[in-house]
């Protein structure tokens, strides 16, 4: 095992992953970056580090072709109650959209056209940032890491404190059904002070064990996203490329969702209006840039059962909106 400084690891990893993706003899599973910023061999579980692999050009094409981000299929103007919309998720049980804003302790049930069909009060006002269905419970995440389990049958709410705090700044919540985990995307610091500020983190709450795993579920290095823009986005001017890199540098997770079609993980950023995409195996896939005209401050993201993409944006001086991109 060879210990290296973070900058050196990031640079070498990105050159290998991004710049040399076409090298057939390079086996990505032999190189990983773990929580101690070391290079080592062999496979590893997700809790022990973030594994990089060469970008698969076919996979990238699939992601790019799946949605036409420049031409949304529908722009839905929301009720004024959702001007500050934050969390967004698809409710498979009722074929509805669940939403919350970042001020009120209210769960909003929307039809697929964005109309409010029901409201449920689950708690006091607070900075709420994500919503997901887990069985008969609707779970709402708060920026300080607390989870609120609202039982639809009894109309009672149970508050669960995790090890995440205000400094971690939880902004996104998603359900990983296959692993029975709630994923919490953090805009702020890592649980461990040893983690670099040039990375963002997702942590996992185990629903069966009722515990938050200390090691990150996913580590997202800024260097990987920047290298993608540098080496894999062509046919634009240098000024346009620099503008995209500036947007990527502002990466601040604001929402998270799993695509039901290929299980890719989409992590939304309100700053810069884009999303980064990682595979179910935690391999980086893509950066998707939204048109800021439609999504000036994207805060919530979800997918329908058929894979249509829905992204919400706060209203600012106007009303909140949900933008739909149909799966092609």
Positions of PLM-derived features:
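Sec-dependent N-terminal signal peptides
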Residues: 9-17
